[in-house]
Amino acid sequence: MDYSLLPKDYDIFRCNQFYFEDHYFLGKKIKKVFFNCSVIFEQYYTFMQLIKNNEYEYADIILSSFLNLGDSELKKIQRLEKLLPQIDLGHNYLKKLRAFDAHLQYHELYENKRITSGVYMCVVATAMGYKDLYLTGIDFYQEKGNPYAFHHQKENIIKLLPSFSQKKSQNDIHSMEYDLNALYFLQKHYGVNIYCISPESPLCNYFPLSPLNNPITFIPEEKKNYTQDILIPPESVYKKIGIYSKPRIYQNLVFRLIWDILRLPNDIKKALKAKKMRLRK
């Protein structure tokens, strides 16, 4: 990243596991922090520990939510709204951009496509009125080697999101083409300027480098004794809230298959017992 390409005053937006990085590449002060729905409960717990440890400062936390999800996800979001009212719901920002929101709804419904977290931040920034967006870290999964600026294969995050055990944890619902189209849409319909501030990034193949050349001397501070993995709350906390009552291992396909096989004899026994009772009647 070339810091001279940044303006003198700017707001920082970060998302997901950014706190894994071993340096404060963009400083400790963050304007908006974005977390995905699937691990928001754990991310919120983790981030509050980061604040407690003076690892970061922030203004707002935003849930990267969509209104066109299934009923189970919508119920989860509604539940979170009551449990964690201090978190802003991202889809409230999306609704301010009616044309873009319709674009998202259509492609999720009919083509099973969704923007990535980095692009989601750009959408929220546009809805907030920002006109100049300076981007780094959005590489459309084109980077060779580790696609992250940090080691992402950590024990707890893999427990919660098994796909992180892979070198590149790309979901089929995401694609470079769809992300690019979303960014172009923001440019065309809302007049935002999108600049790249990492000259070696694949992003520069599609958007120009920032025209700025500020004499900024910024040396990222190296972290010491910092949080390097997502934190999982005590089991007692999960028991307090019904929606998360089962540990996430129950959501693992292999575990559920083995569990169902182990339960099969007992289920057959119950079914035969019920059949005998019906025959007696």
Region annotations inferred by a language model:
Residues 1-281:
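Metal-ion/cofactor- or nucleotide/acyl-coenzyme-handling active-site neighborhoods
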